[in-house]
């Protein structure tokens, strides 16, 4: 009669077979991820094909080393060992490594991180900084021994010899390269005299360029206060650093050209052009001033200067005539008084009359002398005052005191009446004549 085994005995036997079977120690398996829900530590999911399903477990240490995100329905190639779980009698695969089936893990990681950063706005144009037209100092984050720095120095020196280049040496591939690149970019941003940064390296495989796809490098470029030009790999290579940079260059030479958009030759040409324009402008200004000078020489003020004081001469003649008439009237009054005295003296004794007459004559002479002196002094004072006023109105004296004589069509102007916007006026000053155009007319009481 056969012995019956217990369930646990059978399960232990099967587990022993599983553990000692060399074919189950390292299994290479292809399947589709199912029932995946990310957990804080260890990950539990299923792998299936169109006929079967196997449970899969991935410990947290192995899961953190994945270069991509596991997703529901993703077809993957995994490496692991098969074990049997005694309490349930079920078997599963303990996954140690995994990569997407058909494309590499780096490729899927690239697309996943690109999508994440794009959704976060890292690549938006609104965050892009403009490359300055004129730079004095360029920072370069790259390997000190590569061809990148040599190409940049050669190109910048050719295009604009005065620009200084400051190298910030860093690893560009291998373990720890991404962190060192990010730290070096942050260090360069502490330099206050830098105008922009070039970040890059030469060509290589996707593994060689991978440091420039790391999130820490993308964040360092995004946070840079300096404009950043990326130059990673060859023209056909594209990294996440290229997407986040303010400008992307296919080669180090192209990066140097982007960093110096204006060359020394451009500036010299610009200066020459400005010199020619200034020269032509000066010639036109000189010709205009010469034409105005000729017009001023033909002005009535220069051809007939006496017209400026004709009116004052007439006024002086009138004052002289008034003075003469006043003196004549005073003499006539004195004669009349003498006649009246003569009539009064006729009825008086001759001697007494003569005596009285003599006294009257003396008084009259005194009065006449006093009156004549007073009138003369008064008229002389008025004459001198008028003469001073006339002298003060001399055009040369007027303009010497800071005033100007204004004419419109050779006619003196003393009021805003009849003056309109756009009229051309001639303004005589102490040292020359101005041709002016009226821009505005405002009437004000002064």
Swiss-Prot record:
Please tell me whether the keyword Nuclease is annotated for this protein: yes
One of its Pfam families is Exonuc_VII_L
Enzyme nomenclature, EC number: 3.1.11.6
Q: Which domain of life is it from?
A: Bacteria
Output the Gene Ontology terms for molecular function. Answer: exodeoxyribonuclease VII activity; nucleic acid binding
- Keyword Chaperone: yes or no? no
CDD domains on file? ExoVII_LU_OBF
Query: Which family does this protein fall into?
Result: Belongs to the XseA family.
Q: What is the protein name given in its UniProt record? A: Exodeoxyribonuclease 7 large subunit
Task: Tell me what organism the protein belongs to.
Answer: Streptococcus agalactiae serotype V (strain ATCC BAA-611 / 2603 V/R)
**Which lineage do the record's taxonomy fields give for this organism?**
Bacteria, Bacillati, Bacillota, Bacilli, Lactobacillales
Question: Which gene codes for it?
Answer: xseA
